[in-house]
Regions:
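Bacterial Sec-dependent N-terminal signal peptides
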Residues: 1-17
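A short beta-strand-turn-helix
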Residues: 16-33, 62
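Extracellular/periplasmic catalytic domains that process cell-envelope and extracellular macromolecules
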Residues: 27-28, 60-63, 95-99
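Short active-site neighborhood of thiol/selenol oxidoreductases, capturing the structured segment around
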Residues: 29-43, 68
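Detector for the c-type heme attachment site
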Residues: 46-50
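Non-catalytic, surface beta->alpha helical segment in thiol-disulfide oxidoreductase systems
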Residues: 51, 93-147
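Thiol-based oxidoreductase modules, predominantly thioredoxin-like and allied folds used
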Residues: 55-86
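Flexible coil segments in periplasmic/lumen-exposed cytochrome c-class electron-transfer proteins
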Residues: 147-155
Length: 155
């Protein structure tokens, strides 16, 4: 399954067309979306899955505050975002993803969250993120700190 929604309540549950389902779930539950963009060959993606995404505190933060989606940056499955059809690969380009893994945050209405890092405007977090930093990252976005605080002061 190229695109999956992960519901973190102990076991991982997988669903087809999860991207659209995730956006609907986020809107109905007023939760932000975390998109984990990966490729099948990416060792750092697998490391982040095994460490950060498998951490109990991270799972709890995600379960309580976000809807998590995994997006295969080389996938060919068709998805709809903002009324337009994309392949997973096209959507990863739309989100300006050029390295893996990359983490993207969306508002509950599906809009990409922009934030600052070292006073530079960003729309995603490229690269592997250590578990402790990932927890801080989730809290930063959960609490809406991206509106006022530069992420570089947090991680």
């Amino acid at each position: 399954i190229a695109v999956i929604i992960v519901i973190l309540s102990g076991n991982l549950a997988f669903s087809q067309n999860a991207f659209e389902d995730a956006l609907k779930k986020a809107a109905s539950e007023n939760k932000r979306v975390v998109i984990d963009v990966y490729t099948d060959w990416c060792g750092w993606c697998k490391k982040m899955d095994a460490e950060a995404y498998s951490n109990d505190e991270v799972k709890k933060l995600l379960e309580d505050n976000f809807v998590l989606v995994k997006l295969n940056a080389e996938g060919k499955d068709k998805l709809t975002y903002n009324g337009k059809k994309y392949t997973e690969e096209e959507l990863s380009y739309y989100f300006e993803v050029f390295s893996f893994p990359t983490t993207i945050f969306l508002e509950s209405d599906g809009k990409v969250i922009s934030f600052k890092y070292d006073n530079y405007p960003m729309k995603n977090i490229p690269g592997y993120v250590k578990t402790d930093e990932f927890k801080k990252l989730l809290i930063f976005f959960r609490d809406g700190k991206y509106k006022d605080i530069d992420l570089s002061t947090v991680i």
